[in-house]
From Swiss-Prot:
Gene Ontology terms: cellular component: extracellular matrix; extracellular region
Job of this protein: Plays a role in the degradation of extracellular matrix proteins including fibrillar collagen, fibronectin, TNC and ACAN. Cleaves triple helical collagens, including type I, type II and type III collagen, but has the highest activity with soluble type II collagen. Can also degrade collagen type IV, type XIV and type X. May also function by activating or degrading key regulatory proteins, such as TGFB1 and CCN2. Plays a role in wound healing, tissue remodeling, cartilage degradation, bone development, bone mineralization and ossification.
Protein name per the record: Collagenase 3
Residues annotated for Zn(2+) 1 binding in this entry: H173, D175, H188, H201
Propeptide: 20-104
Ranges for region Interaction with TIMP2: 177-247
Taxonomic lineage from the root: Eukaryota, Metazoa, Chordata, Craniata, Vertebrata
Record-linked InterPro entries: Hemopexin-like_dom, Hemopexin-like_dom_sf, Hemopexin-like_repeat, Hemopexin_CS, M10A_MMP, MetalloPept_cat_dom_sf, Pept_M10_metallopeptidase, Pept_M10A
Length: 472
């Protein structure tokens, strides 16, 4: 087995010249360096159809670099251009798992799984970043994620060879798949089988923690153990088995539905699931789609729903879906309201009685603050929507069946507010889920319906499905 792995490693290390040079993206991407191009080509060869003995001997399976790039863009829900552009490089630079991407909640070739339901694991060594008890707790929780939804049982042993051997290492660490230093590749695991099969390795050049600082060991371990049990990567950005690392927050972790479906395909359900409702990723063309918040941001449109947001570029039809915490780890998972203040290059995010001011990826110092700082009485517990008008300096806030008007210049609430929504904007109903303004029209979202409202004529001019904002 070890000699076979060694032979495979040498084949992977030898890269024949079958690939095509990477084309650049738009004119705005002309500043891509030679280092960017080398990095991108290495990324694509590592995670999209890595060279294997079968692939080398059978030339019909050879995949060009451009084909790999298109597959990578499709996998991550990017616009499939076949060109190396900034959004594609942004994804490539994110910390991730070292296992190649194949798609959905499929399994490794030959549908590898454990034949038994009672499995053992051993923690071979420890990271110096955390206490032994913290490391043990992280792995115990990670195994429980999978045992909660399957008939699998995991028992820790302290010596000898376990089904799943867990270790920390750096660079070359004994399996011929070296780590790359801080960030980048965080960990990898092998599918079920003998020898290395099932083993999980963690890069000790990373800073491992039990919080949002560095990399959360529990989150990475739970992902890698999915591979140890036979799962491949998922295209679903909300899935635990999505290849990119995202800190999911301090709240109780619930295994997403995509992962549940995958692991139960292999092993079946467990006796009693403590979390019978598992979070699902929203589907943009769902006819019943409702939204949580909408805002512009530097020419793009950000559309928030549950733990996610769609990022809609003005020149693209396909919206990109991301976990909110993959961009802003410090924000809550769910957003109540959001708006952009373009002249200040700020985006404001609201959740409950708190709000945040963001400049790009960065939260401004002094935030979060309380919405009472804006002049809301204590009876207002949360906002449902917000929209800013740059030409007047006014911001409208919606809460339950009322609308408030805030003067950004004087930083006070306008007199004669709040007012009833249905009186201020006749015909849109008495609640607003999300709202944004564009070219003299206000777009109000209420459940699966959106209203296009003319500011000049003060009336509804069109009624459309909510999902039409996502080109459905």
């Amino acid at each position: 087995m070890h000699s076979a792995i060694l032979a495979t490693f040498f084949l992977l290390s030898w890269t024949p010249c079958w690939s095509l040079p990477l084309p650049y993206g738009d004119d705005d991407d002309d500043d891509l360096s030679e280092e960017d191009l080398v990095f991108a080509e290495h990324y694509l060869k590592s995670y999209y159809h890595p060279a294997t003995l079968a692939g080398i001997l059978k030339k019909s399976t050879v995949t060009s670099t451009v084909d790999r790039l298109r597959e990578m863009q499709s996998f991550f829900g990017l616009e499939v251009t076949g060109k190396l552009d900034d959004p594609t490089l942004d994804i490539m630079r994110k910390p991730r798992c070292g296992v190649p991407d194949v798609g959905e909640y499929n399994v490794f070739p030959r549908t590898l799984k454990w034949s038994q339901t009672n499995l053992t694991y051993r923690i071979v060594n420890y990271t110096p970043d955390m206490s032994h008890s913290e490391v043990e707790k992280a792995f115990r929780k990670a195994f429980k994620v999978w045992s909660d939804v399957t008939p699998l049982n995991f028992t820790r042993i302290y010596d000898g060879t376990a089904d799943i051997m867990i270790s920390f290492g750096t660079k070359e660490h004994g399996d011929f798949y070296p780590f790359d230093g801080p960030s980048g590749l965080l960990a990898h695991a092998f599918p079920p089988g003998p020898n290395y099969g099932g083993d999980a390795h963690f890069d000790d050049d990373e800073t491992w923690t039990s919080s949002s600082k560095g990399y959360n060991l529990f989150i990475v371990a739970a992902h890698e153990l999915g591979h140890s049990l036979g799962l491949d990567h998922s295209k679903d950005p909300g899935a635990l088995m999505f290849p990119i690392y995202t800190y999911t927050g301090k709240s109780h972790f619930m295994l997403p539905d995509d992962d549940v479906q995958g692991i139960q395909f292999l092993y079946g359900p467990g006796d009693e699931d403590p979390n019978p409702k598992h979070p699902k990723t929203p589907e943009k063309c769902d006819p019943a789609l409702s939204l949580d918040a909408i805002t512009s941001l530097r020419g793009e449109t950000m559309i928030f729903k549950d733990r996610f947001f769609w990022r809609l570029h003005p020149q693209q039809v396909e919206a990109e879906l991301f976990l909110t915490k993959s961009f802003w780890p410090e924000l809550p998972n769910h957003v109540d309201a959001a708006y952009e203040h373009p002249s200040r290059d700020l985006m404001f995010i609201f959740r409950g009685r708190k709000f945040w001011a963001l400049n790009g990826y960065d939260i401004l110092e002094g935030y979060p603050r309380k919405i009472s700082d804006l002049g809301f009485p204590k009876e207002v517990k949360r906002l449902s929507a917000a929209v800013h008008f740059e030409n007047t300096g006014k911001t409208l806030f919606f809460s339950e069946n009322h609308v408030w008007s805030y003067d950004d210049v004087n930083q006070t609430m306008d007199k004669d507010y709040p007012r009833l929504i249905e009186e201020e904007f006749p015909g849109i109903g008495n609640k607003v889920d999300a709202v944004y303004e564009k070219n003299g029209y206000i777009y109000f979202f209420n459940g699966p319906i959106q209203f296009e409202y003319s500011i000049w004529s003060n009336r509804i001019v069109r009624v459309m499905p909510t999902n039409s904002i996502l080109w459905c």
